[in-house]
């Protein structure tokens, strides 16, 4: 299956996938069957998606399947890891044993990938990390295609700055903030939390009452928000990494 020197088109497809994910269909993405046999001229790509925890992730998975399709010259092996790192590692090892041309994965957490990525490197299979990032030797993967999560956190704080100014909020009055984080130790969670905190600390009147993991899911986001509303009487701002979770958090507030 090995086809050298063709990783740039794959990265280009993945960049388009991330750009279009927000516009994708919200369908349930399952792991693809491995019964078909690829033709000699197809590029075989094994993808390990971390799960389907949000509308964005589901759209992202749909975009991957649309971009890496047979009509575009690809043979796609797709695995939904269902929020478990061990499932991702198992899928990657399966792709290595099948001698795919490329491995693409969106890591659920940053750490714990060194061994399996070393195995892929020794098998001479290029690995492309998508969306979230990994914390390991960069030589173990070919490229990372994703966003600057720290800057996303800063942008959220900057938006809050402008919103408070527009509402003529008294700069001496305390702004009570609660944070619904994503998955613990995920690069998206770490980066956005860091970026928001950088700007928040320049505002002495911004008080972060609490911050807890909501796993990028509606159910967990609602659970954490219910806890906040029972614990704190005065909440001015909810910071959430996923707009859908944020909307459900407001729904919870109406119910209490």
Language-model segment annotations:
Residues 56-70, 152-156, 187-206, 220, ...:
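Short, solvent-exposed amphipathic alpha-helices that sit
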């Amino acid at each position: 299956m090995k086809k050298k020197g063709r990783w740039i088109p794959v990265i280009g497809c993945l960049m388009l996938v991330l750009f279009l994910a927000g516009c994708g269909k919200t369908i349930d993405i399952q792991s693809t069957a491995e019964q078909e046999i690829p033709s000699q001229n197809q590029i075989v790509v094994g993808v390990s998606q971390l799960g389907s925890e949000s509308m964005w992730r589901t759209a992202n998975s749909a975009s991957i399947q649309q971009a890496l399709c047979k009509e575009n010259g690809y043979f796609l092996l797709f695995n939904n890891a269902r929020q478990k790192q061990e499932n991702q590692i198992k899928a990657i090892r399966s792709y290595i044993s099948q001698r795919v041309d490329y491995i693409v994965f969106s890591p659920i957490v940053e750490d714990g990938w060194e061994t399996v990525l070393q195995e892929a490197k020794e098998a001479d299979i290029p690995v492309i990390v998508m969306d979230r990032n990994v914390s390991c030797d960069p030589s173990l993967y070919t490229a990372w295609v994703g966003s600057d999560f720290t800057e996303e956190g800063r942008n959220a704080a900057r938006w809050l700055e402008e919103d408070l100014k527009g509402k003529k909020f008294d700069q001496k009055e305390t702004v009570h903030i609660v944070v619904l984080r994503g998955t613990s130790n995920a690069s998206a969670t770490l980066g956005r939390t860091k970026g928001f905190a950088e700007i928040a600390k320049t505002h002495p009147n911004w008080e972060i009452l609490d911050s807890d993991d909501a796993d990028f899911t509606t159910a967990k986001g609602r659970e954490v928000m219910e806890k906040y509303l029972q614990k704190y009487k005065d909440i001015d701002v909810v910071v959430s990494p996923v707009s859908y979770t944020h909307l459900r958090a407001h729904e919870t507030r109406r119910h209490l």
